[in-house]
Swiss-Prot record:
UniProt catalytic activity: 2 Na(+)(in) + 3 H(+)(out) = 2 Na(+)(out) + 3 H(+)(in)
HAMAP family reported for this sequence: NhaB
Membrane-spanning segments: 28-50, 67-87, 96-116, 131-165, 254-274, 316-336, 364-384, 396-416, 454-474, 481-501
UniProt-recorded name of the protein: Na(+)/H(+) antiporter NhaB
Entry's localization field: Cell inner membrane
Organism: Shewanella baltica (strain OS155 / ATCC BAA-1091)
Lineage: Bacteria, Pseudomonadati, Pseudomonadota, Gammaproteobacteria, Alteromonadales
Signal peptide: none
Gene: nhaB
Length: 533
């Protein structure tokens, strides 16, 4: 029987999302105008924020751009905020959008070099603990300069490559043969061709490495202004450059990095929380043979491409460290240099590089619409006033925890943007000093980045991993990710809180002032970067 028009509408609306989810979003769209016009705009605003957080938390059911975008369009249409306010937010955060558009695409053209490096780590180093530490540290270093999504994308590509090679060889085929590595490895008679114990151990090994790398991106990403998109927003509002940002964060980020690496060592050493899986000898032999096969096939042309990518990588790090141009423009230069010297001139080949980041860039524009509602309806004013009622380190800890809890269930770009805007408003209104604002900016940045490793909702890199084609192959579920992230969540959150609560952040910052490593900023500088006030 053909579907009725109403059934067809529901079927098309939000695609393959569950029916209950579609009903929830439609209910939100009906309820919001009623609350805004007949109850209270403040209540309606908070309901919208909670609905938006719900769409982010349900990202596995439906990408948040569509449901969140519908809520944002309705909010503008009924007057909760204005289109000009949304545009103002986007203008104020243009550098972040350029970072996502150009930097992520630029690193796409450096994937060969990164693949080469991670492949060598796995095939040359036999100690599982050492491999884990190297993956965690390499991800942390790369994420301090590159986008975390890209770093995870590269490691996923390495893992998929290795999984497919093992699956192919274990199924009785050679390296060059076509093979479906997503099959369960049964022959025509339905019998297992693969050694299940060996395959299970290999899956565990890959899960371990991907989780260490994912946490590594958080450890490195919090350290610099380009490590995560929200860092750039916070740096822009505080008027900090690359070096100053790294120095100001270091009293929290350095102890956290050390404790994170120590956690990596301990969970591997004692095989707890799902870690400690060893790479089977037979699998290692296959991977080494494949790496040797690839090395033998590599031509001078291929080697030249790797050299070009390495040189562009040096330019990228130098350009960012010395602030030779805005982040987005450096990303654009990476695209131009890598493609020009490596001969990527086809328009379709260029277009693939932008596929990864543009959906999230569009989602970020929707974030700014919700931020517009928060500003126009003064939603966070009571919360901020309560937090500002405390003084000194307690105030900093409250902001750290408030950011951390929200970042566990929501996107940290959204959370960081909201809080830094509110603290900036407090500075402009004379409620806090500029020095206290700078300390609060550190608490907001670290609180947004560190506890968010708790769930895939908080870290974009984790969500990207969970929704990748690799996750089901290596049996990496939402619950398993949360469990494996738990030791890191506990350690990173507590060490971050302790660095602030004990006064270490404040004392170290004062030392940096006294040694002229950083300078005192004035509140007047803020007026040039005010967002929506």
């Amino acid at each position: 029987m053909p579907a009725t028009m109403s059934q067809a509408f529901i079927g098309n609306f939000l695609g393959n999302s569950p029916k209950w989810y579609k009903t929830a979003i439609l209910s939100f769209l009906i309820i919001n105008p009623l609350l805004f016009f007949y109850v209270d705009p403040f209540v309606a605003g908070w309901v919208l924020v909670l609905e938006f957080i719900f769409t982010l938390a349900m990202a596995l059911k439906c990408y948040p751009l569509q449901p969140g975008g519908l809520l944002a369009i309705e909010a503008v249409a009924i007057g909760m905020t204005s289109a000009s306010q949304v545009l103002h937010e986007i203008e104020a955060n243009l550098e972040v959008l350029l970072l996502l558009v150009f930097m992520v695409a630029g690193i796409y053209f450096m994937k060969q070099l990164l693949l080469f490096g991670f492949t060598k780590i796995i095939t040359k180093v036999r100690s599982k603990v050492l491999v884990s530490l190297m993956f965690c540290l390499a991800s942390a270093f790369l994420s301090a300069f590159l986008d975390a999504l890209t770093v995870i994308a590269v490691i996923i590509a390495v893992a998929v490559g290795f999984y497919s090679i093992y699956h192919k060889v274990a199924s009785g085929k050679d390296f060059g043969a076509d093979h479906d590595h997503t099959s369960e490895g049964k022959n025509a008679a339905g019998e297992d061709q693969l050694n299940e114990e060996e395959l299970g151990a290999f899956r565990g090994f890959l899960r371990n490495l991907l989780m260490h790398a994912g946490v590594g991106t958080a450890l490195g990403g919090v350290c610099t202004m380009v490590g995560e998109p929200q860092n750039l927003i916070i740096a822009a509002q505080a008027n900090w450059q690359f070096g100053e940002f790294a120095v100001r964060m270091s009293p929290v980020t350095v102890p956290v990095l050390i404790s994170g690496i120590l956690t990596c060592y301990l969970v591997e050493k004692f095989g707890i929380f799902g870690y400690g899986a060893k790479l089977p000898t037979a699998v290692h032999r296959i991977l080494c043979e494949y790496a040797a096969h690839e090395d033998a096939r590599r031509t001078n042309k291929d080697n030249m491409k790797l050299i070009v990518q390495a040189l562009v990588g040096v330019w990228l790090i130098a350009g960012l460290a010395l602030h030779l141009a805005s982040v987005g423009l450096i990303g654009l230069s990476v695209i131009i240099l890598t493609t020009a010297f490596n001969g990527v001139t086809d328009e379709h080949a260029l277009g693939k590089a932008f596929e990864e980041a543009l959906p999230f860039t569009a989602l970020l524009a929707v974030f700014f619409a919700v931020v517009g509602v928060i500003i126009d309806q003064h939603l966070f004013a009571p919360v901020i006033q309560w937090a500002l009622g405390y003084e000194g380190n307690t105030q900093l800890v409250i902001f750290y925890i408030a950011n951390g809890l929200l970042s566990m269930v929501s996107d940290n770009v959204f959370v960081g943007t909201v809080y830094i805007n509110e603290v900036k408003a407090a500075l402009i209104n004379g409620q806090i000093t500029r020095d206290q604002f700078d300390l609060l900016a550190v608490a907001i940045n670290t609180g947004t980045n560190l506890p968010s490793v708790a769930t895939p909702n908080g870290q974009a890199a984790f969500l990207f991993l969970l929704t990748s084609a690799l996750a089901p192959l290596i049996r990496l579920s939402y619950g398993r990710m949360v469990w494996m992230a738990l030791p890191y969540t506990i350690v990173l959150s507590i060490v971050g809180v302790m660095a602030i609560q004990t006064g270490f952040l404040e004392q170290a910052t004062q030392y940096f002032y006294d040694s002229h490593t950083i300078i005192h900023h004035s509140a007047k500088e803020v007026l040039g970067t005010v967002s929506g006030h």
